[in-house]
Amino acid sequence: MEIKAPGRILMSMINAIYGTGGFAREVMPILKEQCPNDENIFIVHKKYMHTQNSINGYPLISYEDFVKISSKDKNVTIAISDTAIRSKVSDQIDNSHIKQKSIVSKTSLTMDNVSISDGVIICPFVTLTSNISIGKNFHANIYSYVAHDCIIGENVTFAPSVKCNGNVIIEDNVFIGTGAIIKQGKKDNPIVIGANSIISAGSFVTRNVSKSTTVFGNPARVLSKSTLK
């Protein structure tokens, strides 16, 4: 199936990964496994277009040209780990009335009563246990897990091997670094990670994290000049 841009081309199925960074290139094989008979491509904003027109053998076109393609089924998944950028791109896609597709690895495990919103990426060897709500555009990188009775907001990023234990609420646009652990909260007193916060790699979070705060260490504490001494 040939991609030509600009122009309007009728296609049956086309799935696009927005982004061409390392994570996007890791996610593409998962998408191919999930949708082997579809046309799977990379897209970026036109100002970030590469000189080549393909990456790892997959077509690359601008988002602006992708919008012009006429297809019975056209989907986008945003594979950009930066939560603020992902939120802006998501709004752009919604304004174009294009569906955001979830990509879920066959080697991941999802248990009972798990609600997953649109545009989610669940990488290999991720576990979602029971009674969990997952917000739009959540990224769970390899070997991460979300345990029981957790609520995950929109545009949340789990780097590899993040461990979110039970009774935790993670608000929108939170980035959690590789190997971070969030201690289990209580049913009547969950641990809350505030919106737009950052949990540094290897941190052990034992209590609430305020909005727009960066924490690090074991136990996790607010990153400041005094705590770095």
Question: What do the predicted segments below correspond to?
Answer:
Residues 1-11:
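N-terminal amphipathic/basic-hydrophobic helices that include classical n-h-c signal peptides
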Residues 10-75:
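A solvent-exposed beta-alpha-beta segment
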Residues 22, 84-85, 115:
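Short alpha-helical
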Residues 28-30, 55, 88-92, 134, ...:
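Short amphipathic alpha-helical segments
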Residues 49-109:
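Phosphate-bearing ligand-interacting subdomains
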Residues 102-216, 220-223:
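Structural signal for interior beta-strand "rungs" in well-ordered beta-sheet cores
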